[in-house]
Amino acid sequence: MQADFVIIGSGSAGSALAYRLSEGGKNSVIVIEAGGSDFGPFIQMPAALAWPMSMKRYNWGYLSEPEANLNNRRITAPRGKVIGGSSSINGMVYVRGHAEDFNRWEELGASGWAYADVLPYFKRMEHSHGGEEGWRGTDGPLHVQRGGFTNPLFQAFVEAGKQAGFETTEDYNGSKQEGFGLMEQTIFGGRRWSAANAYLKPALKRDNVKIVYGLAQRIVIEDGRATGVEIERNGRIEVVKANREVIVSASSFNSPKLLMLSGIGPGQHLQDMGIAVKADRPGVGANLQDHMEFYFQQVSTKPVSLYSWLPWFWQGVAGAQWLLSRGGLGASNQFEACAFLRSAPGLKQPDIQYHFLPVAISYDGKAAAKSHGFQVHVGYNLSKSRGSVSLRSADPKADPVLRFNYMSHAEDWEKFRHCVRLTREIFGQSAFHDYRGPEIQPGEGVQSDEEIDAFLREHLESAYHPCGTCRMGAKDDPMAVVDPQTRVIGIDGLRVADSSIFPHVTYGNLNGPSIMTGEKAADHILGKQPLARSNQEPWINPRAAVSDR
């Protein structure tokens, strides 16, 4: 088997790459995917979002090493093992990120990836339904919508934000990237609109695109050039030959793992694993970043939450309605209100993110209390804590070693304490007067710094936004893995394009910027002139120096 371009991974970036590299029919593309089909309601029905993440069929099922600052808990670290990758098992929340995120990328050496550079690619990929005119794309492959916003608890949340003195925004993916407002979703026609549905399946209708199901073992490197990929398929080892380039889009865990298995990474670590060093790049696997969050939960005194739909019978009713009409509760992820807030005056951008949910549930999807309730997922999104990905052994089937070092920076504790107290202030506004019952979690007895810290150690979880482990930077940066054209430094014919190349975590969910990365990388790979830089300037809060807390 051979193709001009061989892409490892059919996730958010990999699917976009397959679509763009194969346009026009000139170039042949093979996509290697370790997982399988996304057929069925567990993935396609938006309200079933908790299911695929808990199923080994769709999820690599990784765990972190014991986290010292979180009571030595091993934190779940899911990644999609299915066409569409993590876009097929995620929460379907669409966030581009803040303009400052991408300007920071350029400051860190990713020349040509500032906000003005990436905004045209966000527009190219989007088919926005109801976004801000002039700031959003309207004919791209990725459908982005807003929910019905019919539950009164959503409206109470946004109104409470206004009462607390915060901004509101009509479109946080438009010019005003701060405040309370409606959440955007990658849902279309009542279905999850994953990267597979948006990009990969249309690409596979072309004669020049093929998907091969198998586990990538290593990249074949000959005389300093990547020439193919060794895969295991149906119990046999095969080589997929790349006539032009190999592109790794296997996730922030598996992209560095695959590079290291191929001899690209920290030299001493590779030698310890018995792997011949092809390129000593100490940045491979370093710089692991993520978002953390916790659930803040409140009893609702009125029966307006989704609690009534949690019993199996009513879940079945919702599922049947969705199967028949692609409508009803099954057609929404139920994340329809959100907020992006600054935790202190003087900050250039928001650093706290809220997802509001009109039900109080635990991480396994079960009711947190035997009553109606509501909750927010809240987290500090600009942590300075950094971790790493390394090899457990030279066996391609062995899980990578994930050390996040969560909460290893003193500022993290300060910011998360602030999240607890700020959420109490928001839920304490008069907008929630008709709904606010007792606090379920953290609990009204959790007040002091020490009590809050104890709660956080036991209840903080990953928001599932890992990135940064094959960092993009200047060619002379010893910790950079790829240059701003996404080429692996030191090896010809090899690129990485996914969230692993992010120099710094973006503020918000990562599916959107990961797809953008695939879109932009495709132009670099094809030698095209990048899309013209945007001259649009995002809104700046005129009260930024004195407002918020």
UniProtKB/Swiss-Prot annotation:
Alphabetized InterPro entries for the sequence: BetA, FAD/NAD-bd_sf, GMC_OxRdtase, GMC_OxRdtase_N, GMC_OxRtase_C
EC number: 1.1.99.1, 1.2.1.8
Residues the entry annotates as binding FAD: 4-33
Substrates-to-products reaction catalysed: choline + A = betaine aldehyde + AH2; betaine aldehyde + NAD(+) + H2O = glycine betaine + NADH + 2 H(+)
Highest taxon in the source lineage: Bacteria
One Pfam family here: GMC_oxred_C
Annotated metabolic or biological route of this protein: Amine and polyamine biosynthesis; betaine biosynthesis via choline pathway; betaine aldehyde from choline (cytochrome c reductase route): step 1/1
Keywords: FAD, Flavoprotein, NAD, Oxidoreductase
Cofactor needs: FAD
Positions annotated as active site in the UniProt record: 465 (proton acceptor)
Top EC class for this record: oxidoreductase
GO BP: any one term: glycine betaine biosynthetic process from choline
GO molecular function: betaine-aldehyde dehydrogenase (NAD+) activity; choline dehydrogenase activity; flavin adenine dinucleotide binding
Record function comment: Involved in the biosynthesis of the osmoprotectant glycine betaine. Catalyzes the oxidation of choline to betaine aldehyde and betaine aldehyde to glycine betaine at the same rate.
Family: Belongs to the GMC oxidoreductase family.
Protein name: Oxygen-dependent choline dehydrogenase
Natural source organism: Rhizobium johnstonii (strain DSM 114642 / LMG 32736 / 3841) (Rhizobium leguminosarum bv. viciae)
Lineage summary: Bacteria, Pseudomonadati, Pseudomonadota, Alphaproteobacteria, Hyphomicrobiales
